Amino acid sequence: DPPKAMTDRLEEVSRLGPHQYPITMGAPNFRQALSRKCERFMGMKYDPETELVVTIGSTEAMVDTIFALTNPGDKIVMFSPYFENYRAQTIMAGCEPVFVPLVPPAFGFDPEVLEDAFRQHPKAILICNPSNPSGKVFTYDELKLIADLCIRYDVYAIMDEVYEHIVYEGHKHTYMSTLPGMRERTVCCSSLSKTYSVTGWRLGYALAPQNIMDRIKQYHDFNTVGAPSPLMEAAVVGLDMPMSYYEEFGAHYAHMKALFTGGMKELGIPFTDPQGTYFVLADISPFLKKGQSDVDFCVEMAQKIGVGAVPGSSFFDEDVNHIIRLHFAKKDETLTDALNRLESLREKIPARG
């Protein structure tokens, strides 16, 4: 659930307003609060007047950024597996995606394969960190390697950092824009959706130097006009939450992760242990019938045991048919019920033999 302070404020705003169009780039008090929050965690200031725009979720921020930085025919590097919207957004802009595989279980990448992609003279690299769907948190050294390539080949970095506060013990989120030479060529796209449990509020944003932000704002203006003014007003209190909120938030997700992955281990279902986010990639190889697709398996699983999953083929450029994505951002009773249902998987969807 969202923080009570935000829902209480939303109730007040529903009576008192604002209810009219905000300024296109976002309400001033919301942008100022967002700038303060980003400075607190990133250690660098983004000017709320010239380097920040409020969007309809991070999805719009990504679309606006891709259109602002590229021309039709340009190439964009992205890692596979990837959030499925990225490919569509890239193609929609008339660009060509260039995929670099992340290799499970740790989802590392081959530096030489990555540089081969940069040798194709892309306009940008698009990175989700922490990563949906793999749960990978890129290390400082990995980001430094990518940053060095961006500088050497004059490439922009488009960062999707919506899971920045869902990182588990032993891992640390590093903002690409904080690396040497990267602030001037990085666009950070994020949202309030995950951090404050308000996915339906659709409050996102982009951070970028002014020369890039001026172009992003133009696309934003003609795409959506502006974010909802009542929701921005209600969310200001959330952006000023004390550090204790983020500590409790992280502990809560660590609890959900332990509950769900612990149950998966007991059931003997192979999966990758996420370093961040709330996703688990499970290996369904033992359950696939000959010729059955992961899509068909997900339909069968939903029908026979009542657990929903996303087919892994949605996220890979490679021919991958044996992985599904599950998520654990649910209440304990829901996760326990899902695990109880998954316990009947071998009975209701017998392993191939």
Residue ranges and their predicted role:
Residues L102-E169:
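Active-site phosphate-binding strand-loop segment of PLP-dependent enzymes
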Residues Y253-A254, L267-K304:
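Conserved PLP-binding catalytic core of the aspartate aminotransferase-like
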Residues A93, R152-Y153, L267, I305, ...:
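Helix C-cap/helix->beta junction micro-motif
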Residues A68-T90:
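Conserved PLP-anchoring active-site segment centered on the Schiff-base-forming lysine
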Residues D1-G57, D64, D240-M241, K348-G353:
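N-terminal small-domain helix-loop-helix segment of the aminotransferase-like
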Residues M92-V98:
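A short helix-loop-beta submotif of the ANL/AMP-binding
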Residues D116, K290-G291, E300-A309, F315-G353:
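PLP-dependent enzyme catalytic core of the Aspartate aminotransferase-like
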Residues D1-P3, R185-G276:
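PLP-dependent aminotransferase class I/II
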